[in-house]
Amino acid sequence: MIETISKTIKYHFKNPQLLHEALTHPSIISKDSLKFNYERLEFLGDAVLNIVISEMLFNIFPKDTEGNLAKKKTALVCGNQLVKVAQSINLGQFIIMSDGERTCGGANNHNNLENALEALIGAIYLDGGLTAAQNFIHSFWKHTAIHMDIPPQDAKTILQEFIQGKRLPAPTYHIIDKSGPDHNPIFTVELRIPLYKTIQATGNNKKLAEQKAASLMLNQIKDQIK
């Protein structure tokens, strides 16, 4: 497994234990009494990813404003982008998890993929330093960053600006249901805007459900947006 993923990510660990930790899902602890999982490395990897992406954008777009750089960074470190990168290296098949977690689709769970990818970045940073982490991140993010000619706007931002232009109260998002197991929850969010029909959407986390609800609302009112 170590040799296979090392070839895929083009990085060979000097300390394979770090890679093992980065790929260990929390569900494995209670089963095998292991004292580690990827959560601590995920915390570190998130910080490393943010600083490397920030510096990369700063260098690629010397004329961009702070606001545009921030929007691009948000798009590059968001869950959807992390999942795309994780799927491109088939990370899910390498995550060590309990049989129950895998049976429930844990290898394809977006939260698991996001967390394991950030943990992998953290492990590379500890094993090879900042340069190694930069090389890994650049190889999977730089092409996307270079082709971001127009600063991306998420659905919530577009909807917020449209509603402000109508001089209406800001959209509000309310969690009306949470179902599923703790390791793979499903949130149902209701979007409310005065004078508009309420919209409901679901997602594996609150932010994703809110974005889906905003996107559905935009689709409903698209003829009003010029």
UniProtKB/Swiss-Prot annotation:
Residues of the active site: 46, 118
Annotated EC: 3.1.26.3
Top-level taxon: Bacteria
Keywords, alphabetical: Cytoplasm, Endonuclease, Hydrolase, Magnesium, Metal-binding, mRNA processing, Nuclease, RNA-binding, rRNA processing, rRNA-binding, tRNA processing
Reaction(s) this enzyme catalyzes, per UniProt: Endonucleolytic cleavage to 5'-phosphomonoester
Principal localisation: cytoplasm
Oligomer status and interactors: Homodimer.
Designated name of the protein: Ribonuclease 3
Lineage: Bacteria, Pseudomonadati, Pseudomonadota, Alphaproteobacteria, Rickettsiales
Gene: rnc
